[in-house]
From Swiss-Prot:
It comes from the Eukaryota. It is found in: Mitochondrion inner membrane. It catalyses: 4 Fe(II)-[cytochrome c] + O2 + 8 H(+)(in) = 4 Fe(III)-[cytochrome c] + 2 H2O + 4 H(+)(out). Its EC number is 7.1.1.9. Keywords: Membrane, Mitochondrion, Mitochondrion inner membrane, Translocase, Transmembrane, Transmembrane helix. The chain crosses the membrane at residues 31-51, 82-102, 126-146, 159-179, 197-217, 239-259. Belongs to the cytochrome c oxidase subunit 3 family. Component of the cytochrome c oxidase, the last enzyme in the mitochondrial electron transport chain which drives oxidative phosphorylation. The respiratory chain contains 3 multisubunit complexes succinate dehydrogenase (complex II, CII), ubiquinol-cytochrome c oxidoreductase (cytochrome b-c1 complex, complex III, CIII) and cytochrome c oxidase (complex IV, CIV), that cooperate to transfer electrons derived from NADH and succinate to molecular oxygen, creating an electrochemical gradient over the inner membrane that drives transmembrane transport and the ATP synthase. It is a multi-pass membrane protein. It comes from Paracentrotus lividus (Common sea urchin). This is Cytochrome c oxidase subunit 3.
Length: 261
């Protein structure tokens, strides 16, 4: 490798952006094919290629950051701004769902009986599973902060325990959400209420799964001594993302589950 008189890391050629784009195309085409013909093979093939891309791309980044020392302090500082912009874009993403919800609920149309929830819709009790899910996510926010402070204090064992609890709570939340969907007395096809409910909470559930995956990778890396008190941006980025997921859920609970019911 040629020496460069600057502190920035120049990435090497990688096949993963191309395979990631191909997997995205395959999943989109596979989804359409599944809807129209019931054939799910292309969708699952694209998903498998996406997982393969993520695993290998993650492996390369871990190698560059941890074993090759390519992520200097200046490089890490440069990674913080894209992560902040990414979370900001996610805020805008969920803002659209809240806009659709309030547009439909504050002035209900005559087609749904000029009432909210619409006529014939039995909303979920916000003080049962949704309240438990709120407690689970708030608890996970506490444990991820506990893990972060343990890393800063150099207490690796405590950091691993706290991060493990966070991953368990994330999985538990996903199980509860799936159970709630199965038992829900309405579907995504039941008026604008069902559409906004399942799209907003469903995309949040997807973000919880993604965040849990991030934290699981961080747990593996933490167990492998990849993080130190001064070099753990991968964990910090995952923690930021998890706190964002927590905050979005609080808005979902208050607006859709409690006020919307």
């Amino acid at each position: 490798m040629m020496a460069h008189q600057h502190p920035y890391y120049l990435v090497e050629q990688s096949p993963w952006p191309l395979t990631g784009a191909i997997s995205g195309l395959m999943m989109n085409l596979g989804l359409v094919l599944w809807f129209h013909t019931g054939n799910i093979i292309l969708l699952f093939t694209g998903l498998l290629l996406l997982i393969l891309t993520l695993v290998n791309w993650w492996r390369d980044i871990v190698r560059e950051a941890t074993f090759q020392g390519s992520h200097t302090a200046i490089v890490e500082n440069g990674l913080r701004y894209p992560m902040i912009l990414f979370i900001t874009s996610e805020v805008c993403f969920f803002f659209a769902f809240f806009w659709a919800f309030f547009h439909s609920s504050l002035a209900p149309a005559v087609e749904i009986g000029v009432t909210w929830p619409p006529s014939g819709i039995t909303p979920l009790n916000p003080f049962l599973v949704p309240l438990l899910n709120t407690a689970v996510l708030l608890s996970s926010g506490v444990t991820i902060t506990w893990s972060h402070h343990s890393i800063l204090a150099g207490n690796r064992n405590e950091a691993i325990q706290a991060l493990f609890l966070t991953v368990v709570l994330g999985i538990y939340f996903t199980i509860l959400q799936a159970w709630e969907y199965i038992d829900a007395p309405f579907t995504i096809a039941d008026s604008v209420y069902g559409s906004t409910f399942f799209v907003a909470t469903g995309f949040h559930g997807l973000h919880v799964i993604i965040g849990t995956t991030f934290l699981l990778v961080c747990l593996i890396r933490l167990s492998g001594h990849h993080f130190s008190t001064h070099h753990h941006f991968g964990f910090e980025a995952a923690a930021w993302y998890w706190h964002f997921v927590d905050v979005v859920w609080l808005f979902l609970y208050v607006c859709i589950y409690w006020w919307g019911s």
